[in-house]
C-alpha cells in the first residue's frame, strides 16, 4: 500500500539533492500532477522555485484566470504566466498529423521555458511526469509533451512523481493539503485541446472545443458522476454533417462526447451514463454553439482506443 508521508519526506530530500541549491522553475498546468510536484519542490527549496504557467491558447475556457486565482492569490506561489498563444497557433497552422502536433507543442513548450529560465537565471526544470507518461512513450503509443524533449535542452530535469500513478498522486495531493478542486481535478492532456481537435487546429474549431468542453464539465459537475468518472470531455471531429437550424439546411461540425472510468489511465472503460444527461449536453452544445450540427457519443474502451482522440 502506498504511504504518503514517507514518500513526501524522501521526495523533498531527493529534490534538494538533485537541485543542489540551483534556481528552479516548474511547469505548472493546474492539474494534480504538476500541482503536487510544485508543492513538493516549494517545500524542498522555497523561494528558489518559480512556477511558470504557459498559456498556449490550447487550454480550457477561463483557465489562465483560474490558475492565477488558485495558485497566486490563494496558495501564494511565486507564479509567472507566459502568454504564448500566438507562437503555438502559428506553428500548428496546417498540421494534421497528431504526432507532429505533439512534437511541435513539446518543442515550443520547452523553448518557452528555456527562454524564461535564461531571463530569470534558472537552471533546473521540475516536471509532473507520472508513470503512464513515460510507459506510453517507451511503448511508442503516444509521445507525451513532457517526455520527448528537443535536442540541445539547457535545463536539467527533475521528475519527483515519475514512478507514481494518478491515484497515488491524488493521495499525495490530499496529504499535502491541496484544495479538493485540484486534488480531484480530472486529468487534462499536456498538449491541451490540440488532442481534442482532429485535423488542423483552426480558430473556429478551437473556439468550438473550448465551449463544448466547458458545457460538458458544467453539466457533469452538477452530478455525482464528477466523483466517479476519470475523464469527461468533448472533441471536435475533422468532419462536417448536415443539420437543420430553423427551416434552413446547415452543414457544420460534429462534436464527440467521451466519458471514461479508470484507476490509473493504463486501462479505461466507458460506464453507463444517464441518457437524459447525454441529451441535455447535446442540446446545449447544438443550441449554444452555432457552428455545430451534430453530437455523437464515443463508447470505446482503452484498449483498443486511447482515452484522448489524438
Curated annotation (Swiss-Prot):
Residues that hold ATP according to the record: 29-35
Keyword ATP-binding assigned: yes
UniProtKB keywords: ATP-binding, GMP biosynthesis, Ligase, Nucleotide-binding, Purine biosynthesis
InterPro entries referenced in this protein's UniProt entry, alphabetically: GMP_synth_C, GMP_synthase_B, GMPS_ATP_PPase_dom, NAD/GMP_synthase, Rossmann-like_a/b/a_fold
A GO term, aspect molecular function: ATP binding
Residues covered by the GMPS ATP-PPase domain: 2-185
One Pfam family this sequence matches: GMP_synt_C
Pathway this chain belongs to: Purine metabolism; GMP biosynthesis; GMP from XMP (L-Gln route): step 1/1
UniProt keyword annotation of Lyase present: no
CDD domains in the cross-refs: GMP_synthase_C (cd01997)
Enzyme Commission numbers on file: 6.3.5.2
Catalytic reactions on record: XMP + L-glutamine + ATP + H2O = GMP + L-glutamate + AMP + diphosphate + 2 H(+)
Record's GO cellular component terms: cytosol
NCBIfam families associated with the record: guaA_Cterm
Function noted in UniProt: Catalyzes the synthesis of GMP from XMP.
Quaternary structure annotation from Swiss-Prot or TrEMBL: Heterodimer composed of a glutamine amidotransferase subunit (A) and a GMP-binding subunit (B).
Protein name, per record: GMP synthase [glutamine-hydrolyzing] subunit B
Lineage of the species this protein comes from: Archaea, Methanobacteriati, Methanobacteriota, Methanomada group, Methanococci
Amino acid at each position: 500500500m502506498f504511504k504518503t508521508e514517507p514518500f513526501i519526506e524522501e521526495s523533498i530530500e531527493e529534490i534538494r539533492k538533485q537541485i543542489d541549491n540551483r534556481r528552479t522553475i516548474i511547469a505548472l498546468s493546474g492539474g494534480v500532477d504538476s500541482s503536487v510536484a510544485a508543492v513538493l519542490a516549494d517545500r524542498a527549496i522555497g523561494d528558489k522555485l518559480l512556477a511558470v504557467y504557459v498559456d498556449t491558447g490550447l487550454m480550457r475556457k477561463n483557465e489562465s484566470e483560474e490558475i492565477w486565482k488558485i495558485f497566486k492569490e490563494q496558495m501564494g506561489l511565486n507564479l509567472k504566466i507566459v502568454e504564448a498563444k500566438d507562437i503555438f497557433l502559428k506553428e500548428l497552422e496546417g498540421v494534421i498529423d497528431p504526432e507532429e502536433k505533439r512534437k511541435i507543442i513539446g518543442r515550443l513548450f520547452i523553448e518557452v521555458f528555456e527562454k524564461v529560465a535564461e531571463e530569470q537565471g534558472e537552471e533546473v526544470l521540475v516536471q509532473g511526469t507520472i508513470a503512464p507518461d513515460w510507459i506510453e512513450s517507451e511503448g511508442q503509443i503516444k509521445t507525451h509533451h513532457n517526455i520527448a524533449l528537443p535536442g540541445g535542452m539547457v535545463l536539467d530535469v527533475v521528475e519527483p512523481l515519475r514512478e507514481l500513478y494518478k491515484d497515488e498522486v491524488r493521495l499525495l495531493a490530499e496529504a499535502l493539503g491541496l484544495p479538493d478542486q485540484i486534488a480531484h481535478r480530472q486529468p487534462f492532456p499536456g498538449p491541451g485541446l490540440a488532442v481534442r481537435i482532429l485535423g488542423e487546429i483552426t480558430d473556429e474549431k478551437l473556439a468550438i472545443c473550448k465551449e463544448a468542453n466547458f458545457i460538458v464539465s458544467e453539466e457533469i459537475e452538477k452530478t455525482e458522476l464528477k466523483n466517479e468518472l476519470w475523464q469527461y470531455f468533448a472533441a471536435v471531429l475533422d468532419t462536417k454533417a448536415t443539420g437543420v437550424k430553423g427551416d434552413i439546411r446547415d452543414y457544420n461540425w460534429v462534436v464527440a462526447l467521451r466519458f471514461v472510468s479508470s484507476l490509473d489511465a493504463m486501462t479505461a472503460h466507458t460506464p453507463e451514463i444517464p441518457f437524459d444527461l447525454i441529451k441535455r449536453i447535446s442540446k446545449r452544445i447544438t443550441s449554444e454553439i452555432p457552428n455545430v450540427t451534430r453530437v455523437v457519443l464515443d463508447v470505446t474502451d482503452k484498449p483498443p482506443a486511447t482515452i484522448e482522440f489524438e
